[in-house]
């Protein structure tokens, strides 16, 4: 009888431990990445407003040359300044979580799926399922009410797949720390890239290229050279 009691006790204890891990996964994950990738922050002076549209402005600026994790050099050509305030739907870190199969594997810090406007409200966000594979983002939803509020076109034009290149190690670490649900502000440049293998890749410069009637999210992605990150009330440069 006593052996049976202890067996049940340890089973229940194990189930409880698993539940606690699941419930606190974000907290545990956040501490893990903060420990593995320490970053220095200052206090932000402005609150983030994820209801706003991203801002960009065409720019004429010299090329930026960056060295990847294998010490190979790529050229970034800024085409616009960029400022986006949004909620993180997915953070896929390079190269641990993403394998593209070209020079980008060692150049990019991470891929962020970001939502803003109405989609930053959990009422809508919880009804949309996002996935990410091989640097491509897809999403779907089953609630037909979303077709009218906020509307299919609104959804497709208020989510973006962003490929990020950190301007320095501190920003690289801060970007890797980001978790699903974080409210962030990212500033930098939209850039066209010439890779170490001379492959050329252009950034998207409009949010509407995610929208094609009847075909789903088949549009382009933003390539962002990140010079500043705000995560909540913490500012990283």
Predicted regions and their residues:
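OB-fold and OB-like single-stranded nucleic-acid-recognition modules
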Residues: 4-237
């Amino acid at each position: 009888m006593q052996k049976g009691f202890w067996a049940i006790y340890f089973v229940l204890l194990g189930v409880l431990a698993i539940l606690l891990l699941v419930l606190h996964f974000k907290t545990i994950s956040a501490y893990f990445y903060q420990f593995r990738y320490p970053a220095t922050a200052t206090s932000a002076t402005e609150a983030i407003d994820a209801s706003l549209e991203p801002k960009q402005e065409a720019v004429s600026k010299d090329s930026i040359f960056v060295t990847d994790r294998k010490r190979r050099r790529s050229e970034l050509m800024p085409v616009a300044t960029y400022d986006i305030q949004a909620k993180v739907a997915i953070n896929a870190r390079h190269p641990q979580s993403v394998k593209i199969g070209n020079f980008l594997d060692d150049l990019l810090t991470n891929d962020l799926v970001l939502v803003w406007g109405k989609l930053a409200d959990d009422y809508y966000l919880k009804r949309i399922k996002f996935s990410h594979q091989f640097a491509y983002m897809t999403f779907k939803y089953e609630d037909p009410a979303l077709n009218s509020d906020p509307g299919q076109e609104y959804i497709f034009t208020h989510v973006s797949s962003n490929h990020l290149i950190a301007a320095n190690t501190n920003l690289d670490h801060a970007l890797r720390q980001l978790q699903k649900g974080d409210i962030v502000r990212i500033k930098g440049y939209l850039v066209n890239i010439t890779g170490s293998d001379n492959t050329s890749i252009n950034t998207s410069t409009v949010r509407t290229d995610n929208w094609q009637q009847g075909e789903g999210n088949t549009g382009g992605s933003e390539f962002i050279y990140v010079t500043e990150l705000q995560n909540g009330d913490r500012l990283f440069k």
